[in-house]
From Swiss-Prot:
Family: Belongs to the FAM20 family.
UniProt-recorded Gene Ontology molecular function terms: protein serine/threonine kinase activator activity
A Gene Ontology BP annotation from the UniProt entry: enamel mineralization
Free-text tissue specificity from the UniProt record: In the mammary gland, expressed at higher levels in lactating mice than in virgin mice. Observed throughout the tissues of the mandibular incisor, including the secretory and maturation stage ameloblasts, the suprabasal layers of the gingival epithelium and the odontoblasts. Weak expression in the enamel matrix.
Subcellular location: Secreted; Golgi apparatus; Endoplasmic reticulum
GO CC field: cytoplasm; endoplasmic reticulum; extracellular space; Golgi apparatus
Subunit-level organization: Interacts with FAM20C; probably forming a heterotetramer of 2 subunits of FAM20A and 2 subunits of FAM20C.
Cysteines joined through disulfide linkages: C314-C330, C319-C323, C378-C452, C453-C512
Protein name as catalogued: Pseudokinase FAM20A
Gene for this chain: Fam20a
UniProt note: phenotype after gene disruption: Mice survive to adulthood and show biomineralization defects such as severe amelogenesis imperfecta (AI). In addition, mice develop disseminated calcifications of muscular arteries and intrapulmonary calcifications, similar to those of fetuin-A (Ahsg) deficient mice, although they are normocalcemic and normophosphatemic, with normal dentin and bone.
Length: 541
């Protein structure tokens, strides 16, 4: 019996020693870290160090599935990193809550003529498209003896791309309060692809050139149409240039690379300017093997895939755009960055007009256009239909402001929906040649503004607001781009260039006002009802 009691005592002592060691080496250090905030892990949301940009990006990507980022809605509150109490709301949140972004647009949306699509007609059209897809897919599988357990596609009217199309109206491609846009961005980022193909333009041009006559054989036009599992589709532009690279000085604008990150950033800037004329665009890491090669039915596209010496999967475009494998794009080994821009409604449903830009550049190695030589060129334009009897010229100037901010010299045409007539807005498509050189401000892009000395009051008020410290353009762009999966989308020099170029625009307007007077320069256009006093800016400052 004494021996048994001794064994029990030894066991209790051993357990006590183990518990003490665990308390000292594991529990006590955690208690100490909780008591000393400066020593908390870096990932803690209330620690002395802010989470990294990549964590912000990942969180934004996760939250898109459940949160609707309507532009006037509240963004998540951000805890102060050291004091532990709520910090002031973000600049992006404050911007979209400003009265300029709340005022009702004029004229109000009243009837069917204000919406691009007739909903019932559009839904019938899309149902037929899905049924035709299912028939063709079945024939394709039978032709090649393919077995697939995938059920036929079902058309869903609530799909985000359908709601985006039905929401296009006479004010813009989407409303400020649209809930479908956040869902569409999320779906394009995450939905699996079911097909990949060349665009219709590229199909029409395949083989219709002599590769030896190409000025610079490069992948500037390498792009694909991807269709997703919800039957939505987007234009995919792969990464051709690293973010840190600038366009060389001796490159002509018409042979510059098309940059995927420029397409993404252009959508965010367009939204911040409250134009809403750029189709929703996101970045995505695409598996070129699983999401392009294995789902395409185009034999030409299949034939241009190869494995590089570094064991990366690559593909290139056929003539006329480039003719050699050294101009291919490659995954790493399968994953490739790219931009995805949502398609607009079919031309069968919503015809568009493509119009040459009056300030088009000379697409030759020498020579200049009239506007580059004649400072009074705008007087001539004002005498020509439709610039003599509509707000079209103000739309051209809006587009010039947008292009100057992103540094896009390649706006040779613009498109409009024919339904909205001469006063309809210009759609800002194909922005991939923007953000090429942050160190140079191409003043010639502002020629429509400088020569015509006109600008919409609404546009000017937004520009002046974005020049204020509380709503600084570079800051709200930086914050907005954190939502994207490929963040950081722009390098810091490109963001700072936006502020510099904004000041140049405002100085140009100021010079116009000094020369011609405010009444001749500031145009009401088809902007909006009068904003509250808090939203008015000093037009001469």
């Amino acid at each position: 019996m004494p021996g048994l009691r001794r064994d029990r005592l030894l066991a209790l002592l051993l357990l006590g020693a183990l518990f003490s060691a665990d308390l000292y080496f594991h529990l006590w250090p955690q208690v100490q870290r909780q008591l000393r905030p400066g020593e908390r892990p870096a990932a803690c949301p209330c620690s002395g160090r802010a989470p990294s940009a990549s964590l912000h990006s990942a969180a934004a990507s996760r939250d898109l599935g459940t949160a609707s980022h309507n532009f006037s809605g509240a963004l998540p509150r951000v805890e102060h990193p050291s004091r532990g109490h709520p910090a002031p709301r973000s600049k992006l949140q404050a911007l979209f809550a400003h009265s300029l972004y709340q005022v009702l647009e004029d004229p109000p949306l009243l009837g069917p003529e204000d919406w691009l699509l007739a909903s019932q007609e559009a839904l019938r059209y899309y149902r037929r498209k899905v049924a035709r897809w299912n028939r063709r897919h079945k024939i394709y599988k039978e032709q090649f003896n393919l077995t697939s357990l995938d059920p036929p596609l079902q058309f869903r009217p609530e799909a985000s791309w359908v709601q985006f199309h039905l929401g296009i109206n006479s004010h813009g491609l989407y409303s400020r309060s649209s809930l479908a846009i956040s869902k569409l961005l999320h779906d394009m980022r995450h939905f699996p692809t079911i097909s990949a193909d060349y665009s219709q333009d590229e199909k029409a041009l395949l083989g219709a050139c002599d590769c030896s006559q190409i000025v610079k054989p490069s992948g500037v036009h390498l792009k694909l149409v991807l269709r997703f599992s919800d039957f939505g589709k987007a234009m995919f532009k792969p990464m051709r240039q690293q973010r840190e690279e600038e366009t060389p000085e001796d490159f002509f604008y018409f042979i510059d690379f098309q940059r995927h990150n420029a397409e993404i950033a252009a959508f965010h800037l367009d939204r911040i300017l409250d134009f809403r004329r750029v189709p929703p665009t996101v970045g995505r890491l695409v598996n070129v093997t699983k999401e392009i090669l294995e789902v395409t039915k185009n034999e030409i596209l299949q034939s241009v895939f190869f494995v590089s010496p570094a064991n990366n999967v690559c593909f290139f475009a056929k003539c006329p755009y480039m003719c050699k494998t050294e101009y291919a794009v490659c995954g790493n080994p399968h994953l490739l960055e790219g931009s995805l821009s949502a398609f607009l409604p079919s031309l069968n449903l919503a015809p568009r007009l493509s119009v040459p830009n009056p300030w088009i550049r000379s697409y030759s190695l020498s020579g200049k256009e009239e506007w580059e030589l004649n400072p009074l060129y705008c007087d001539t334009v004002k005498q020509i239909y439709p610039y003599n009897s509509s707000n079209r010229l103000l739309g051209i100037i809006d587009m010039a402001v947008f292009d100057f901010l992103i540094g896009n010299m390649d706006r040779h045409h613009y498109e409009m929906f024919t339904k909205f007539g001469d006063d309809g807005y210009l759609i800002h498509l194909d922005n991939a040649r923007g953000f090429g050189r942050h160190s140079q401000d191409e003043i010639s892009i502002l020629a429509p503004l400088a020569q015509c000395c006109m600008i919409k009051r609404k546009t000017l008020l937004h520009l002046q607001l974005l020049a204020q410290a509380d709503y600084r353009l570079s800051d709200v762009m930086r914050e907005s781009l954190l939502e994207d999966q490929l963040s950081p989308v722009l390098t810091e020099p490109h963001l700072l260039a936006l502020d510099r170029r904004l000041q140049i625009i405002l100085k140009t307007v100021e010079d116009c006002i000094e020369a011609h007077g405010e009444r001749r320069v500031i145009a009401e256009g088809s902007a909006q009802r009068s904003a509250p006093d808090s939203g008015q800016a000093n037009l001469t400052s």
